[in-house]
Amino acid sequence: MVLLAENKDEMIANFKLHDSDTGSPEVQVALLTHRISYLTEHVKVHKKDHHSRRGLLILVGRRRSLLDYLRKKDIERYRSLIERLGLRR
């Protein structure tokens, strides 16, 4: 399912650090994870859609960069986020 405004607001509410938080690494990673899971299912069905596959790889790289940044800055926040999102690592 595509990320609708209601879903996006709900995800931001679940991962925000303070009231006006929309850009913290936790929020960004959560939104990217949702988009990645959607694109993963799309690519499984449409195997020849290389354009979407490339977009998926770009998103995975962006999420990896944010997670690496968070791990360097605050390991406890990183571990908490990984556990909440159910990511491997």
From Swiss-Prot:
GO terms for biological process: translation. NCBIfam families: S15_bact (TIGR00952). Belongs to the universal ribosomal protein uS15 family. One of its GO terms (cellular component) is cytosolic small ribosomal subunit. This is Small ribosomal subunit protein uS15. One of its GO terms (molecular function) is rRNA binding. The lineage of its organism: Bacteria, Pseudomonadati, Thermodesulfobacteriota, Desulfobacteria, Desulfobacterales. It comes from the Bacteria. PROSITE patterns: RIBOSOMAL_S15 (PS00362). Signal peptide: none annotated. It comes from Desulforapulum autotrophicum (strain ATCC 43914 / DSM 3382 / VKM B-1955 / HRM2) (Desulfobacterium autotrophicum). One of the primary rRNA binding proteins, it binds directly to 16S rRNA where it helps nucleate assembly of the platform of the 30S subunit by binding and bridging several RNA helices of the 16S rRNA. Part of the 30S ribosomal subunit. Forms a bridge to the 50S subunit in the 70S ribosome, contacting the 23S rRNA. Keywords: Ribonucleoprotein, Ribosomal protein, RNA-binding, rRNA-binding.
